[in-house]
């Protein structure tokens, strides 16, 4: 069995799931400020460290999707965040797209960006401990959408993403 297959099966073993903890700094700021906590790098780290240290992690979570800021952070106990996640029996993952933008030629639809420089980012993320990735494909669904342009554009982006990710061992 390939390493990628092994990881995929272990992430969902015994009914475990994936924790999406890839909130951007902006989203984390909104969450923390809603409870009157300043959104500093330290407070965002403490929030995530508490989440990743929970006793429920080992029982329920097989993989954790991280944000660029988080995968590079070190916990208060001087452990790298991906190492903390691994110590709890989960695989660290990383969100690698850079957002959805308006699709040229179809202003009511989106295309996911982030392919430029992806190979280099993937190698870096792998060295930090990431073993799987997340990429969003955004489609409007209605009687008029998705358009052929959107389907083809997003399929092409997803195919390029998939090849690069597998090439880098994730």
Language-model features: locations:
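Alpha/beta catalytic barrel-like cores
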Residues: 1-128, 141, 150
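Helix-rich catalytic cores of soluble enzyme domains
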Residues: 118-170
């Amino acid at each position: 069995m390939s390493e990628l297959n092994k990881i995929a099966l272990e992430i969902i073993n015994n009914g475990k799931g994936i924790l999406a903890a890839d909130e951007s700094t902006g989203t984390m700021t909104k969450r923390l400020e809603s409870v009157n906590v300043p959104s500093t790098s330290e407070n965002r780290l403490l929030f995530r460290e508490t989440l990743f240290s929970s006793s429920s992690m080992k029982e329920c979570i097989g993989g954790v999707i991280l944000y660029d800021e988080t995968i590079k952070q070190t916990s208060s106990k001087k452990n790298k965040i991906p190492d903390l996640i691994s110590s709890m029996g989960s695989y660290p993952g990383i969100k690698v797209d850079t957002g959805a933008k308006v699709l040229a030629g179809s202003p009511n639809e989106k295309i996911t960006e982030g392919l430029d420089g992806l190979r280099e980012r993937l190698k870096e993320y792998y060295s930090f401990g990431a073993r799987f990735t997340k990429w969003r494909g955004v489609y409007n669904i209605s009687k008029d959408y998705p358009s052929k342009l959107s389907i083809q554009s997003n399929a092409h982006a997803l195919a390029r993403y998939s090849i690069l990710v597998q090439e880098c061992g994730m």
